[in-house]
Amino acid sequence: MKHTPKNVIYHNLVGLRVEVLAHPDPSMKGLKGRIIDESKSFLTIEKDNGELVKVQKLGTFVLVLPSGRKVEVRGELLRGRPEERLKKFLKA
């Protein structure tokens, strides 16, 4: 299944570029990088300088799809493990 704006929340996000637009922790706002790991509640982002940062799946994110298209996503839609989100998609 290809990443599209409608189904991106049901995919594993590892490998996608991301930017934090808004977050309850103000130090996370503006953070950019590549998602290298994803858990139920956190994204691990590798910044361009190689630094790893764990970010809670709260606030608002911009994900860059493999096609280059940018999608704005609310963090609460990303909560849960990728396989759990996919199960919800398949049931719908």
UniProtKB/Swiss-Prot annotation:
Chief site of localization: cytoplasm
Substrates-to-products reaction catalysed: Endonucleolytic cleavage of RNA, removing 5'-extranucleotides from tRNA precursor
The catalytic activity of this protein is classed by the Enzyme Commission as 3.1.26.5
User: Gene encoding this chain?
Assistant: rnp1
Kindly list the GO molecular function terms attached to this UniProt entry: ribonuclease P activity; RNA binding
Q: Name one GO cellular component term.
A: ribonuclease P complex
Q: Where in the cell is it found?
A: Cytoplasm
Q: How does it assemble?
A: Consists of a catalytic RNA component and at least 4-5 protein subunits.
Q: Does Cytoplasm appear among the keywords?
A: yes
Protein family per UniProt: Belongs to the eukaryotic/archaeal RNase P protein component 1 family.
What are the BP-aspect GO terms?
A: tRNA 5'-leader removal
Q: Where is the signal peptide?
A: none
Keyword entries, A-Z: Cytoplasm, Endonuclease, Hydrolase, Nuclease, tRNA processing
Q: What is this protein called?
A: Ribonuclease P protein component 1
| Gene3D superfamilies xref list | Ribonuclease P/MRP, subunit p29
The task this protein performs is described as:
Part of ribonuclease P, a protein complex that generates mature tRNA molecules by cleaving their 5'-ends.
